[in-house]
């Protein structure tokens, strides 16, 4: 053999079998940035149709977690696939930089503003802290292979962005959507500030569940409403009973609310202390049961409408409150009578406005009752629940109480219960200029993926309250408005003033607002009457208006609007919604054309990531151990529309899949050794049939892969890629061609046909891989022949190219069409089972020791005969003869194909030292005593002729 070794076309490539990604990827990254890969892509795609994926900004605090990695990788895969599809798809990553978490981190270092440091110094410290956090996260994202404008990202704290956020506020005010109101808002007593809907999370909490008596101020007036005849009025005090789980709100009670069409019953409670109580008829039994009242009877009935404006005594204060009517009253639980405190609830506030009720708010920003709060001054509201219960017992107003576990709003930062508290705030009004209806209309024009996203956001927008956009914080974009000191009306020249302030902020940042002398801007006369608003904007406003502050403003987008927003499914109540509402308020249209959502990352058992459980998978650990391409492949392999599971075992499966794809690519590259596309490509019509079939399979795969990319169905991309590499190529084509590729005449037609197919296929394969396994695709690209088929030099990077358009398929009218090769593969699969059995029974060693006789029915025999002597190369045996089924021998074995029996014989022919086939002509040719005639031709002659395989 040694004398013929140099005549073989052994595979050779510098592309290593082992990825060693953790070591190699950083080296590739360095080259990408040294050679400005992102700039090269932008240059290559200049003037093409644009695709804008607008980045939802992560918060600039802490290390990135696996959820960040999932989100950014999905975006990067989609953008790279769009680039390969011929789009100009710039990516400008962003960061959310204002707000409380950063304030809290800075407070730990320098104390609260106004104590050791001034507010101005505090803001500067916040800016420095956020900048450092951005840099840390940026490096982590770059390590994942994410390409973008990393040197020029957008940060909501950039002076120009802060200025544009103020301009957005001005536009919303201009369009009539801004509202100043004294309204109940979500309030965190730990933050000392209002919260947006998106900053509230719900968790279970145990509260006191209480039924409270409100005595009738005029018993006769109440009894008259129930139409009771004289002598049948019953005995004892008359009370209406409310149910609540927030006893601390009772000091602010200003009404009891009923439903107009609901039936209410006046119940006579019997016993030593008789009394008469009013509850909804439907709930009477459950009220009596929980109060432990066994002996009672009904005295009369009335509707809620009958009882409207009847007065009842507050349970512990000296004033009376009216019975009012509201549609929010239900019979799901409670008593059918709702305690109404307009200062502590949105529905209470709304119904209170209809009746002109006082909006009482006895609670300070720290959650403590104000000094003038009778009975409870100085107590924290949650601790005061017990005090309220004691007072109710004293006054004889407590009918029943028990501990009650229920879902309750909590601050997403502090994880502590929040309250509703009426304060003067600025709102984007959903109603006063028809914003809610406009937003609901705009939703219908957006493509939501998955489609349930549409109904989800519709429900949220339809039911949401006014958007409270003001915050009482230090580190935030100011609500740059001037209001009249007495009337609180906006300055009549607000639009011009906002633009002047925005210009100042563009030069000096938000501190310019606090440094601004009102008289300088307004003049002395106006300055005497108007004052600056000192509140800051909700950070959801900051990020929500980036469709204007960033997308409309950045020249990289060339005036294009965002095509896509892609975030986690929690953003229907967060960024998707704040962006939608602000865009409709500013531009009367949605800020996006399509919205794609992904689920949350959980562990292999479906549990949330938790440090206490110890199941956290950090992206940095994965890249340091396995490499970013494994993490990227994991992301693309999942159905990201639901929960996305990750664990060491799941990542190991991704690593295994990666190895199969890498090894397939390596086979292609190793067998292109010595191939020059400019001179060595075989014309399509002259190629061996099986080679054309393989290119056709690549074409079919490419069509499906491109479609899957277009549908953002990334796991379908991975499945098709795996199927192509493992099944169509690995299990069949590559297995069959090894003999021809290694043993055919070097540079001869048989080898060059095979190499032509391999070249075309790897040109396509490397592009399919590029959006997902970006580092490996770049590595493959650099190991490919430097020249392309047309003689031009290969681009420096695969990412600047487009899908390969040089593939071709078999025509269905051809004799050896796709259906033919499908049948051949089935035969091969059946034969392989018999060969495996023969090996197990020690009849043969390898398959080349076998000679086959295939007894086939006429239809199948005719197909097999088309391959002639080349059938043996497809079946990987030294001989394969086709005979009619009628001649079937006793030794022939049945297969799982109807009409096919196969006899496996051990060959008696000599083994060729070069190709290892056993043929009768081994050693029969002078000068070549150990090789077969085919090999002699490949070594010294014209080379063997292959037509089919």
Swiss-Prot record:
Cofactor note: Binds 1 zinc ion per subunit.
Residues at which L-isoleucyl-5'-AMP binds: 567
GO CC field: cytosol
Subcellular localization: Cytoplasm
Residues at which ATP binds: 611
Keywords, alphabetical: Aminoacyl-tRNA synthetase, ATP-binding, Cytoplasm, Ligase, Metal-binding, Nucleotide-binding, Protein biosynthesis, Zinc
PANTHER family: ISOLEUCINE--TRNA LIGASE, MITOCHONDRIAL, SOLEUCYL-TRNA SYNTHETASE
The protein's required cofactors: Zn(2+)
Protein's job: Catalyzes the attachment of isoleucine to tRNA(Ile). As IleRS can inadvertently accommodate and process structurally similar amino acids such as valine, to avoid such errors it has two additional distinct tRNA(Ile)-dependent editing activities. One activity is designated as 'pretransfer' editing and involves the hydrolysis of activated Val-AMP. The other activity is designated 'posttransfer' editing and involves deacylation of mischarged Val-tRNA(Ile).
Binding site for Zn(2+): 912, 915, 932, 935
Motif ('HIGH' region): 58-68
Oligomer status and interactors: Monomer.
Main location: cytoplasm
EC number: 6.1.1.5
Motif ('KMSKS' region): 608-612
Gene Ontology biological-process annotations: isoleucyl-tRNA aminoacylation
Top-level taxon: Bacteria
Protein name (record): Isoleucine--tRNA ligase
Listed GO MF terms: aminoacyl-tRNA deacylase activity; ATP binding; isoleucine-tRNA ligase activity; tRNA binding; zinc ion binding
InterPro entries in the record: aa-tRNA-synth_I_CS, aa-tRNA-synth_Ia, Anticodon_Ile_BEm, Ile-tRNA-ligase, Ile-tRNA-ligase_type1, Ile-tRNA_ligase, M/V/L/I-tRNA-synth_anticd-bd, Rossmann-like_a/b/a_fold
Family: Belongs to the class-I aminoacyl-tRNA synthetase family. IleS type 1 subfamily.
Keyword Nucleus annotated: no
Organism: Vibrio cholerae serotype O1 (strain ATCC 39541 / Classical Ogawa 395 / O395)
């Amino acid at each position: 053999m040694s004398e013929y070794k140099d005549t073989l076309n052994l595979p050779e490539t510098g592309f290593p079998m082992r990825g060693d990604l953790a070591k190699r990827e950083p080296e590739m990254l360095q080259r990408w940035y040294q050679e400005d890969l992102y700039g090269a892509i932008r240059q290559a795609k200049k003037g093409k149709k644009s695709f804008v994926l607008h980045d939802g900004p992560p918060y600039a605090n802490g290390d990135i977690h696996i959820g960040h990695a999932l989100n950014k990788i999905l975006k990067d895969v989609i953008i790279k696939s769009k680039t390969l599809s011929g789009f100009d798809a710039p990516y400008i990553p962003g960061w959310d930089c204002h707000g409380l978490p950063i304030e809290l981190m800075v407070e730990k270092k320098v104390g609260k503003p106004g104590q050791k440091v001034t507010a101005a110094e505090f803001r500067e410290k916040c800016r420095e802290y956020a900048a450092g956090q951005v840099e840390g996260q940026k490096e982590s994202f770059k390590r994942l292979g994410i390409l973008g404008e990393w040197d020029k990202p957008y940060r909501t704290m950039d002076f120009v962005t802060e200025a544009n956020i103020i301009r957005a506020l001005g536009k919303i005010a201009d369009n009539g959507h801004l509202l100043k109101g004294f309204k109940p808002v979500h309030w965190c007593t730990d933050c000392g500030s209002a919260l947006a809907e998106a900053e509230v999370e719900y968790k279970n909490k145990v509260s006191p569940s209480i039924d409270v008596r409100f005595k009738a101020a005029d018993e006769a007036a109440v009894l008259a409403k129930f139409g009771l005849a004289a002598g049948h009025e019953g005995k004892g005090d008359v009370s209406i009973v409310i149910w609540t789980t927030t006893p601390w709100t009772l000091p602010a009670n200003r009404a009891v609310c009923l439903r107009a069409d609901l039936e209410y019953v006046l119940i006579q409670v019997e016993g030593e202390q008789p009394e008469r109580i009013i509850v909804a008829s439907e709930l009477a039994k459950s009220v009596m049961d929980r109060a432990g009242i066994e002996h009672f009877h009904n005295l009369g009935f009335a509707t809620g409408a009958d009882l409207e404006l009847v007065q009842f005594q507050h349970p512990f204060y000296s004033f009376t409150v009216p019975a009012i009517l509201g549609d929010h009253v239900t019979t799901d639980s409670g008593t059918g009578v709702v305690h109404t405190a307009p200062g502590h609830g949105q529905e209470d506030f709304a119904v209170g406005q209809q009746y002109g009720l006082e909006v009482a708010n006895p609670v300070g920003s720290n959650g403590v009752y104000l000094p003038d709060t009778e009975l409870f001054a100085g107590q924290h509201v949650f601790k005061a629940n017990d005090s309220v219960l004691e007072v109710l017992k004293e006054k004889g107003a407590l009918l029943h109480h028990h501990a009650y576990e229920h879902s309750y709003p909590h601050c997403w930062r502090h994880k502590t219960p929040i309250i509703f508290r009426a304060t003067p705030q600025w709102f984007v009004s959903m109603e006063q200029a028809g914003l809610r209806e406009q937003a609901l209309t705009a939703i219908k024009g957006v493509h939501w993926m998955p489609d349930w996203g549409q109904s989800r956001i519709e429900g949220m927008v339809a039911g949401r309250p006014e958007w409270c956009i003001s915050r009482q914080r230090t580190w935030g974009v100011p609500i740059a408005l001037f209001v009249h000191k007495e009337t609180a009306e906006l300055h009549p020249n607000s639009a011009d003033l906002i633009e002047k302030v925005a210009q100042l902020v563009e030069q000096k940042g938000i501190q310019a607002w606090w440094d601004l002398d009102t008289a300088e801007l307004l003049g002395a006369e106006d300055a005497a009457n108007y004052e600056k608003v000192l509140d800051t904007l909700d950070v959801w406003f900051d990020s929500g208006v980036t469709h204007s502050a960033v997308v409309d403003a950045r020249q990289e987008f060339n005036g294009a609007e965002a095509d896509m927003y892609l975030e986690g499914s929690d953003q229907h109540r967060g960024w998707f919604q704040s962006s939608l509402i602000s865009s409709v308020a500013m531009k009367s249209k949605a800020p996006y054309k399509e919205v794609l959502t992904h689920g949350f990352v959980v562990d292999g058992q479906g549990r949330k990531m938790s440090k206490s459980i110890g199941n956290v998978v950090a992206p940095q650990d994965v890249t340091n151990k396995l490499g970013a391409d494994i993490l990227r492949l994991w992301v693309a392999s999942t159905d990201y529309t639901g929960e996305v599971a990750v664990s060491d075992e799941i990542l190991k499966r991704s690593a295994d899949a990666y190895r199969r794809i890498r090894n397939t690519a390596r086979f292609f590259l190793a067998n292109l050794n010595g191939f020059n596309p400019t001179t060595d490509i075989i014309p399509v019509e002259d190629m061996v049939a099986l080679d054309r079939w393989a290119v056709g399979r690549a074409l079919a795969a490419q069509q499906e892969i491109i479609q899957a990319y277009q549908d953002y169905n990334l796991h379908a991309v991975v499945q098709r890629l795996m199927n192509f590499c493992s099944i169509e190529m690995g299990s069949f084509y590559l297995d069959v061609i090894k003999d021809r590729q290694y043993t055919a005449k070097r540079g001869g037609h048989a080898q060059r046909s095979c190499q032509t197919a391999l070249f075309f296929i790897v040109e396509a394969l490397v592009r399919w891989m590029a959006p997902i396994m970006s580092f490996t695709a770049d590595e493959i690209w650099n190991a490919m022949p430097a020249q392309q088929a047309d003689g031009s030099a290969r681009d420096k990077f695969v990412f600047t190219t487009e899908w390969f358009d040089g593939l071709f398929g078999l025509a269905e009218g051809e004799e050896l069409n796709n259906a033919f090769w499908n049948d051949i593969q089935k035969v091969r699969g059946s034969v392989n089972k018999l060969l495996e059995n023969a090996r197990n029974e020690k009849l043969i060693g390898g398959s080349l020791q076998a000679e086959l006789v295939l007894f086939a029915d006429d239809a199948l025999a005719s197909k097999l005969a088309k391959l002639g002597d080349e059938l043996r190369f497809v079946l990987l045996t030294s001989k394969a003869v086709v005979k009619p089924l009628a001649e079937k021998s006793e030794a022939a074995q049945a297969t799982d194909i109807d009409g096919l029996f196969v006899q496996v014989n051990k060959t008696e022919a000599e083994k060729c030292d070069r190709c290892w086939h056993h043929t009768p002509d081994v050693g029969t040719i002078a000068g070549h005593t150990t090789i077969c005639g085919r090999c002699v031709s490949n070594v010294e002659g014209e080379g063997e002729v292959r037509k089919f395989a």
